[in-house]
């Protein structure tokens, strides 16, 4: 799995919008494509199986940057600064790594956390490393009519402005959830691979061109 985003290029095919007579038309771009902010990874959540039960009370006494409050949460929290990440360690031996900006950083952080526990005498392994969620964000640099967006795709959108200011958009392929704001900002969640973020961006870009709010 690649740890870097592949470049996204937008061609005329990406900008085609079907008209009523089924002939594609090209909608005038709200802003030049080179001004649009491509998705940037904000957080990667990964899991690892250590295949070893962990005495969390023992670890919190012996590791400096560790926190454990079983009344509030059933996992031990450890933080490291390089790469800057946070780990949740469960008694069962499950390790959750959050805060990574690349897959390689997440894997490296996971190995460092495993090493910390190994130095304490735990016979840990590093098995089944898996990316569970990739969160990214971008700015389209043009305003979006959220009302038009939910009219365009009523079955896969949810908009409750009194509760949340953005549209929740459920993309089918790739299967992800996007949070879309009137300002043009988008948050991508639920991706399992970096490539899915890029594909989701290309898909939503074509849709948002149809609901660009040129009045703002």
Curated annotation (Swiss-Prot):
UniProt KW Repeat keyword: yes
Sequence repeats: 38-121, 126-210
Pfam families associated with the record: TBP
InterPro entries: TBP (IPR000814), TBP_CS (IPR030491), TBP_dom_sf (IPR012295), TBP_eukaryotic (IPR033710)
Gene Ontology BP annotations: DNA-templated transcription initiation; positive regulation of transcription initiation by RNA polymerase II
Coiled coil feature spans: none
Cell compartment(s), UniProt: Nucleus
Family: Belongs to the TBP family.
Function: TATA box-binding transcription factor. Members of the TBP family are differentially required to regulate transcription and development during early embryogenesis.
Protein name as it appears in the record: TATA-box-binding protein-like 1
Organism, as annotated: Entamoeba histolytica (strain ATCC 30459 / HM-1:IMSS / ABRM)
């Amino acid at each position: 799995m690649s740890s870097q985003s592949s470049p996204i290029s937008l061609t005329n095919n990406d900008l085609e919008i079907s008209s009523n007579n089924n002939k594609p038309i090209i909608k005038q771009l709200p802003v030049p494509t080179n001004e649009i902010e491509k998705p940037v990874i904000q957080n990667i959540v990964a899991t690892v199986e250590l295949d070893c039960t962990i005495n969390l009370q023992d670890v919190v006494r012996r590791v400096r940057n560790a926190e454990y409050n079983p009344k509030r949460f059933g996992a031990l929290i450890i933080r490291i600064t390089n790469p800057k990440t946070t780990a949740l360690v469960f008694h069962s031996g499950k390790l959750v790594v959050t805060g990574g900006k690349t897959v390689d950083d997440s894997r490296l952080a996971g190995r460092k956390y495993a090493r910390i526990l190994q130095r304490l005498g735990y016979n840990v392994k590093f098995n089944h490393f898996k990316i569970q969620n990739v969160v990214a964000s971008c700015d389209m640099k043009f305003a979006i009519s959220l009302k038009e967006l939910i009219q365009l795709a009523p079955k896969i959108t949810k908009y409750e402005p009194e509760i949340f200011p953005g549209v929740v958009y459920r993309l089918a392929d790739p299967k992800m959830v996007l949070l879309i704001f009137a300002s043009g900002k988008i948050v991508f969640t639920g991706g399992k691979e970096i490539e899915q973020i890029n594909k989701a961006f290309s898909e939503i870009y074509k849709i948002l061109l149809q609901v660009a709010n040129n009045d703002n």
